Amino acid sequence: MANTTITGSGVVSASDYKYVKWVGRTKGGEAVQIELPRAICRSNPDWKFEEKTEAVAEIEFEGVYTDENLAKDDRTEPWKLSGPGASESVKAIQLGVGRFYVGNTAEDAKPVGLTRGGGSFVVERSFHDINADEDPGSVEGRIWQDEGRPKLKLSALEWLDKIPTLYAGIKTVTA
């Protein structure tokens, strides 16, 4: 068997940007999915050396905008929540139970993890006001959204794929 070395590459390459999807169910059993059409894993490798299998690995992907869309002045946030369960209350969606898919595109995405033990989906937004002299506070029509950073964090019961396909800035050398 060949000797394999995994190490940090020190660079973010085009192949580090992925299509990411989580598929699960609501408490009522309705299907729901969260998609990040282009995302990068900003998680740091954090592996615990333990004898027990109770340790649950956690990984986080952040959705990214594309230059192509921004050139067309398309600032649509890079995430989607869809499926019959998408209209249910936020409390009904169980991010801890489902499958986690990663690929270069939606068509070639394959399951890379079975999730359990929780997770989170958050869109971190920042806004600023355009204020004129003596405005007492925010004024309708003069609030601008600067950013929207969708982040999908999942805990995996079992990883079904190899480490270099998930983390950004990782390279593999086989001798």
Question: What is each PLM-predicted segment?
Answer:
Residues 1-175:
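Signature of extracytoplasmic/envelope-associated structural regions
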